[in-house]
From Swiss-Prot:
This is Serine palmitoyltransferase 1. It comes from Bos taurus (Bovine). Residues 37-473 are cytoplasmic. GO terms for cellular component: endoplasmic reticulum; endoplasmic reticulum membrane; serine palmitoyltransferase complex. SPT complex catalytic activity is negatively regulated by ORMDL proteins, including ORMDL3, in the presence of ceramides. This mechanism allows to maintain ceramide levels at sufficient concentrations for the production of complex sphingolipids, but which prevents the accumulation of ceramides to levels that trigger apoptosis. It is found in: Endoplasmic reticulum membrane. Residues 1-66 are annotated as: Interaction with SPTLC2. The modification Phosphotyrosine is found at residue 164.
């Protein structure tokens, strides 16, 4: 039966071939030949080429003009006119061979040149050596690292802490460890560059609210709430984060934490608090903006800070609940893929914590000096003070811009240079202008430390005022 059926099909095919129109057969034949040609032909043609003559080669070489390896840079660019520091940048700093009072370094508690920190670091150096030569997960965890994490957790009154070997990488690693693609982040417009890099790495949906404007933040939260109601299934798996600084690097202002906590619970969001400037500065015991406002540490989901300011060491830390911190040990890129903090720096940070706990009055002294310099800098012709009176890092901006950022920078740099000639070391706030999301105006940064005397503060204010009148008027 099968053979008969096959013969019948063959007969039908031959009959259909005879009955088909001629143009149909021609078209099918052309297509079959084209397919055969494609199967057996090469995917490319060898182009016929003729070698250039010696004369033609010489002409091409003569005409060729190489592009510059780097873009042209003016001779007065800051990168080509750097200052050379000799010795530790403590209360007095030697810049380009000239001794000045240091109003530029974030040595808020004056611990950078402290003998106790030096002794602790030296003892650790003799015991452990210089570095660890490995990340925390690969034989880079020393007992001093665990001691420091335990001390930080107890000092901040949290369940657990984790340390990073580089301050900038701390918040830049913590953000993408939790916030992923599809999550929503509400961030302050004045957020520092480290937060910006963390947001970029997270690939989350970023919503920016005006600086310290809680009405604008609530507007964005309400808009998101309306969007969530349209798609409840998606809303259930979408996480919402509010990321702010305790004391803003770019403005010297304190975040309104009580209002932020209210919005957190009202709209079911998580708060990440970056406290690199406020840790060791604000609060009765230097615990930061939570202690400053009397807010429970449990109301904040994650706190991050570097140890390069008040603790006069290197690296950074995050603290919070244990399940939050443990997640970073496998997901924090700066923790997993960087060599761990050198033990000598961890030992120095522990000793700095000891000093902070032994002498809590140091924070009141710093606060009082911040208020004095803030008041003394008011009313300088041509300059305005940006920042709160309790901030140890203030900004001096031009009252009226020239309309050109480059000219503004040059004017402020001239003030910095002349102040340095008179024994006051200042610095401009520097930014990667092409990478900043919202570029702050040019400014001179004035940093207050506990080591500065009343005479130092008065001298700095009077020097800045005199130089500003000379340069700007």
């Amino acid at each position: 039966m099968a053979t008969v059926a096959e013969q019948w099909v063959l007969v039908e095919m031959v009959q259909a071939l005879y009955e088909a129109p001629a143009y149909h057969l021609i078209l099918e034949g052309i297509l079959i030949l084209w397919i055969i040609r494609l199967l057996f032909s090469k995917t490319y043609k060898l182009q016929e080429r003729s070698d250039l003559t010696l004369k033609e080669k010489e002409e091409l070489i003569e005409e060729w003009q190489p592009e510059p390896l780097v873009p042209p840079v003016s001779k007065d660019h800051p990168a080509l006119n750097y200052n050379i520091v000799s010795g530790p940048p403590s209360h007095n700093i030697v810049v380009n061979g000239k001794e000045c009072i240091n109003f530029a370094s974030f040595n808020f508690l004056g611990l950078l040149d402290n003998p106790r920190l030096k002794a602790a670091a030296l003892a650790s150096l003799k015991k452990y050596g210089v570095g660890t030569c490995g990340p925390r997960g690969f034989y880079g965890t020393f007992d001093v690292h665990l001691d420091l994490e335990d001390r930080l957790a107890k000092f901040m009154k949290t369940e657990e802490a984790i340390i990073y070997s580089y301050g900038f990488a701390t918040i830049a690693s913590a953000i993408p460890a939790y916030s992923k693609r599809g999550d929503i982040v509400f961030v302050d417009k004045a957020a520092c560059f480290a937060i910006q890099k963390g947001l970029q790495a997270s690939r989350s949906d970023i919503k920016v609210f005006n600086h310290n404007d809680m009405d604008d933040l609530e507007r964005l939260l309400k808009e998101q709430e309306i969007e969530d109601q349209k798609n409840p299934r998606k809303a259930r798996v979408t996480r919402r984060f509010i990321i702010v600084e305790g004391l803003y690097m770019n403005t010297g202002t304190v975040c309104p934490l009580p209002e932020l906590v209210k919005l957190k619970y009202k709209y079911k969001a998580r708060i990440f608090l970056e406290e690199s400037l406020s840790f060791g500065v604000l609060g009765e015991h230097g615990r930061g903006v939570t202690e400053h406002f009397g807010i429970s540490i449990d109301d904040i989901d994650l706190i991050s800070a570097n140890m390069e300011n008040s603790l006069a060491s290197i690296g950074g830390f995050c603290c919070g609940r244990s399940f939050v911190i443990d997640h970073q040990r496998l997901s924090g890129q700066g923790y997993c893929f960087s060599a761990s903090l050198p033990p000598l720096l961890a030992a120095a940070a522990i000793e700095a914590l000891n000093i902070m706990e032994e002498n809590p009055g140091i924070f009141a002294v710093l606060k009082e000096k911040c208020k004095r310099i803030h008041k003394a800098l008011q009313g300088i012709p041509g300059l305005k003070v940006v920042g709160e009176s309790i901030s140890p890092a203030l900004h001096l901006q031009l009252e009226e811009t020239t309309g050109c950022r480059e000219r503004d920078v040059k004017l402020l740099q001239e003030i910095v240079t002349q102040c340095m000639d008179r024994g006051i070391a200042l610095t401009q706030a520097r930014y990667l202008e092409k990478e900043e999301k919202y570029l702050p105006p040019p400014s001179i940064r004035v940093v207050v430390t506990v080591e500065q005397t009343e005479e130092d503060l008065e001298k700095a204010a009077s020097t800045i005022s005199e130089v500003a009148q000379t340069v700007l008027l």
